[in-house]
Amino acid sequence: MLIKQRKGWEISESRVTPEHMFLNRRAFMGTAAGAAALLSTGAARAEDDPSVGLYPAKLNATYADAGRAVTPLEINRAYNNYYEFGTSKQIYDAAEALSIRPWSVVIDGEVEAPITLAIDDLLKKVQLEERIYRHRCVEAWSMVVPWTGFTLKSLVEMAKPKAEAKFVRFETFNKPEVAVGQQPGLFSSYPWPYVEGLTMAEAMNDLSFLVTGAYGKPLPKSMGSPIRLHLPWKYGFKSIKGIVKIS
């Protein structure tokens, strides 16, 4: 019987990296490198935000550890879903077309005190803090992000919800003239603007966080600026971006 002796430089087939994994890694490394080159540009854009003086905010010690290292900003910016601007993960440039000043948030519905607040007026009424949360995507990837914002509960309480209010509805902007994903095409049948919802109990949970900043600076447009939701116990699609209305 012929027995083949493996040479020292040979490895078994089981140890060979599959082609698709190799190609995906190459694509990821290329994306990360490109994002790193754009990082300084993104920082400059953040400095132009009128709320820049509010950051960084004090870290809330209760939410100082998500059990994993914080994901670098250049990776976060380079791998992000924001379907209003297309299906590519690299939507940071497309999102820059969105103007975030002026920007107002309407709070209405089954409340005793409906209000409409410009984003900068809203920021004057809340206490910003930093929380480190894990962000999980239904696509089977996750990140750890140092978010800055305030509890959803504090905003809901401003509007004084009535006893019959059972749910909270969120609505994003609708600007197809700048948001290419809202234009006729792949998502043309989707009923824009995007909406999400929570039970009142979920909305009043202390974990529910309205985000206006990240990494010690105003929130980048590609991450949902000027205001988005983050729910660390739910998949990312529930954390709606670019909020203009809460009912």
Predicted regions and their residues:
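Structured, non-membrane catalytic/scaffold regions adjacent to prosthetic-group chemistry
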Residues: 49-247
